[in-house]
């Protein structure tokens, strides 16, 4: 279907008997035999996202999976997820832990608790973890994160991981000095989601003091400092079009991101974002999210893409489907169960009551059920990052 190391183009074949002017899906179908070296243009990306027929969707899925296997291999990278604090200074309109939500019981794990979670991940061979929290920008928080990163590195060194666990941070917008401080402490990946690359949609999701320009600048700063940079968007937002999602995909490409974490929009009952009555069904948002994963894989080839927990919130097999459509990262929960229910960004979050051991075994079975295998005792860094670093040196 495609050749390793080359781009992919999907040609469309008209179906004259069903062709209707102005409708993207009707009148076209994918032909697996006609995928060849080339590039994915805006029109093709739009048609991938618009696809509805089972035949077209399966062809897209198979092409994305083939690209993944050729460019990244068949392993799934695990990132133990430690949601270490739900205290947040931001007031995002879609978020369950927003500053104004007085119904949330706030918590912050102790340093010892965070290190214990990290040691558990290392013992299970995860190789990496994600430290995620609500946004804070005070010195106490910056110092605490730096101390946690250093402690994790010191306490998780082994023969297999001589530098300790790989660490991804997901703690929002910070100053360049703070980003540099954490990088020097030992964090080497950073996930900062845009939620939408359309300025008007970004503004609808965030309060006025959070600006589109500041978040774009933060992503550029992270890349300049040497982080592996990740971002992502929500899919199926009120007022969001397929053209907006195509713009998101092209923004991933133009920014040269190394990692993508995106998933379906799921409302939270205590968040004020309007338009919940305008969003598609759970099935429709799940399907569109899977096609976004496939489109990102076909467009970007060798980045790391997460099969997010939100996929499983809409379908029991959501994360497995994400893997089959081109994802290669899963973030199993290791947050202590006693606080996990207080970190709900959206309603219906799964795995709130399963302990880390249960999540570990469950995900291993899920991964193996789709013919993939877990990558143990390795950071599982983005192949895209290695490629761009090699190019920079050259």
Stretch-by-stretch model annotation:
Residues 49, 79-82, 102-105, 129-142, ...:
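Glycine-rich, proline-tolerant flexible connector loops at the mouths of alpha/beta enzymes
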Residues 1-54, 122, 253-394:
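Auxiliary Fe-S-binding modules of radical SAM enzymes
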Residues 129, 136-139, 164-170, 174, ...:
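Conserved strand-turn element in the central/C-terminal portion of the radical SAM core barrel
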Residues 64, 92, 131, 192, ...:
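Conserved, mostly hydrophobic/aromatic
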């Amino acid at each position: 279907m495609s050749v390793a190391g080359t781009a992919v183009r999907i040609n469309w074949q008209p179906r004259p008997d069903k062709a209707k002017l102005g409708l993207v899906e009707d009148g076209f179908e994918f032909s697996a035999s006609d995928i060849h070296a080339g590039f994915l243009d805006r029109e093709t990306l739009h048609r991938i996202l618009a696809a509805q027929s089972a035949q077209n969707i399966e062809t897209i899925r198979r092409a994305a999976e083939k690209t993944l296997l050729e460019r990244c291999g068949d392993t799934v990278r695990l990132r133990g997820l430690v949601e270490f604090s739900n205290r947040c200074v931001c007031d995002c309109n879609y978020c369950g832990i927003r500053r104004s939500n007085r119904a949330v019981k706030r918590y912050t794990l102790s340093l010892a608790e965070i290190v214990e979670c990290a040691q558990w991940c290392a013992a299970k061979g995860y190789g990496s973890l994600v430290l995620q929290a609500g946004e804070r920008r005070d010195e106490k928080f910056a110092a605490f994160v730096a101390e946690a990163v250093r402690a994790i590195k010191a306490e998780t060194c082994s023969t297999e991981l001589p530098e300790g666990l790989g660490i991804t941070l997901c703690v929002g917008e910070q100053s360049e000095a703070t980003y540099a401080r954490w990088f020097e402490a030992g964090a080497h990946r950073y996930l900062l989601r845009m939620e939408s690359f359309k300025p008007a949609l970004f503004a609808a999701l965030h309060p006025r003091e959070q600006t589109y320009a500041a978040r774009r600048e933060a992503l550029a700063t992270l890349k300049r400092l040497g982080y592996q940079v990740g971002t992502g968007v929500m899919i199926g937002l009120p007022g969001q079009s397929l053209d907006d999602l195509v713009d998101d995909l092209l923004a991933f490409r133009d920014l040269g991101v190394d990692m993508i974490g995106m998933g379906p929009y799921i409302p939270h009952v205590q968040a004020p974002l309007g338009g919940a009555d305008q969003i598609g069904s759970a099935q429709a948002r799940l399907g569109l999210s899977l096609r976004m994963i496939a489109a990102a894989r076909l467009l970007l080839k060798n980045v790391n893409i997460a099969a997010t927990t939100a996929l499983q919130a809409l379908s029991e097999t959501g994360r497995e489907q994400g893997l089959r459509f081109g994802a290669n990262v899963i973030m199993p929960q290791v947050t202590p169960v006693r606080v996990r229910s207080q970190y709900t960004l959206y309603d219906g979050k799964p795995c709130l009551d399963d302990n880390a051991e249960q999540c570990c075994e469950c995900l291993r079975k899920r991964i193996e059920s789709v013919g993939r295998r877990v990558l143990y005792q390795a950071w599982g860094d983005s192949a895209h990052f290695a490629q761009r670093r090699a190019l920079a040196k050259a």
